[in-house]
Amino acid sequence: MTGLDMETIFAKIKDEYARTDDVGKRQIQGHIRELQVGFYSDWDVVMRLSSGPLQVALAKVAIDLGIFRSLKESDTPITLAEFVKKTGASPRLLGRILRTQAAFGLIKETGPQEYTSSAFTDVFANSDAAGAVVQLFDISGPCTQILPDFLAERNYQDITSNKDCVFQKAFGSDLTMFEWMPQHPKHMESLGHLMALERPVSWVDHFPILEELGKFPAPDKVLMVDIGGGFGQQSKALRAKFPNLPGRLIVQDIPQTLANAQPAAGIEFMEHNFFEPQPIQNAKFYYLRHVFHDWPDEQCVLILKQIIPAMGPESQILIDEMVIPSTGVPWQAAFTDLLMMNSLGGVERTRAEWDDLMEQAGLEIIQSKVYDSKEQAILVAVAKRT
């Protein structure tokens, strides 16, 4: 087969990928992954799999040295000598690091000791993507390394407590991760970036908010309380999508998180611990995104029970989380499930597990819509009918 034929095939795949929806993109990614493995020898498979931790470490080094941002901002390739001048690093050491980063595609080699941006570079020049990598390397990385020994020591029993999970063993602490994090501001900051990282598909494009809104009473009433809402990225997305929606949008989170939140028109920020009674009464929506997967069932029920007394007759709880299918679980969902288990004793839940959780809290799910190929969904819960 000629090089031209390969280029034609590659162009067709790129074109199809650009035109297809989220489900189609996932299918193409899966086929490419299978194709790659089919071409590998046993040695290749072992080395490729084992290189994962090193690739993340190399990305972290590039973030720390500002390599990604420098390449993104430069119109011309940057030489090793220029990077040495920028960073103060040893020429020999930095040369070895840069060539390995290039070998894995994190950056692109354009000549001897000369580099430019790759597709990965452009991603990690984004502060939220970079912060997400830092968080996963610093926190999830040590937990992942310890996981096999932890499971063996516990005879492979369920992890159901955030006070007795892999995190405590990895970090030598009796604290839960959320108790430990505020004592380490740099990790709180990177967690905020991970939470703020934009997903390719948003709930605001799929939830029928105008229909559910009904006859919302007045602009001075609270339309939505974004509980545990971090920097307010979901409320900002809602306001951007529907700029004329009546009512107030309130983002609630702990002070350490809100300290890094940027003000936004039409968005209010309020310090609140969601284990304490909800102070905002009669909001139309109480929205929680990626809150419940952080917690075991007992704490999830407690969070829900803090909201219920504040709800009015027309109030709804919107839960923006994954709903794990019985088969064909996307790797991103399965990966996240074990990350939550390791660090927090948390879990990504099936629909049956969500129903059971609502039952324990005195709620019921009246609507459920999976809105992306990674099984992210909106669950609408109300007080259980008697």
UniProtKB/Swiss-Prot annotation:
Domain of life where this protein originates: Eukaryota
| UniProt keywords, alphabetically | Methyltransferase, S-adenosyl-L-methionine, Transferase
The record's Gene Ontology biological-process terms are: aflatoxin biosynthetic process; methylation
The record's GO molecular-function terms, alphabetically, read:
demethylsterigmatocystin 6-O-methyltransferase activity; protein dimerization activity
Q: Gene3D superfamilies from the xrefs?
A: Vaccinia Virus protein VP39 (3.40.50.150), Winged helix-like DNA-binding domain superfamily/Winged helix DNA-binding domain (1.10.10.10)
Binding sites annotated in the UniProt record for substrate: 137-150
Span of the signal peptide: none
Q: What is its EC number?
A: 2.1.1.109
Which pathway? Mycotoxin biosynthesis; aflatoxin biosynthesis
User: Matching InterPro entries, A to Z?
Assistant: COMT-like (IPR016461), O_MeTrfase_dom (IPR001077), Plant_O-MeTrfase_dimerisation (IPR012967), SAM-dependent_MTases_sf (IPR029063), WH-like_DNA-bd_sf (IPR036388), WH_DNA-bd_sf (IPR036390)
Q: Where is this region: Substrate binding?
A: 177-197
Catalytic reaction annotation: 6-demethylsterigmatocystin + S-adenosyl-L-methionine = sterigmatocystin + S-adenosyl-L-homocysteine + H(+)
Residues annotated as binding S-adenosyl-L-methionine: 228-229, 253, 273-274, 289
Identify which residues the record assigns to the active site: 293
* Role: Catalyzes both the conversion of demethylsterigmatocystin (DMST) to sterigmatocystin and the conversion of dihydrodemethylsterigmatocystin to dihydrosterigmatocystin (DHDMST) during aflatoxin biosynthesis.
What does the sequence similarity comment in the record state about its family? Belongs to the class I-like SAM-binding methyltransferase superfamily. Cation-independent O-methyltransferase family. COMT subfamily.
Query: What's the name of the protein?
Result: Demethylsterigmatocystin 6-O-methyltransferase
Gene name per UniProt? omtB
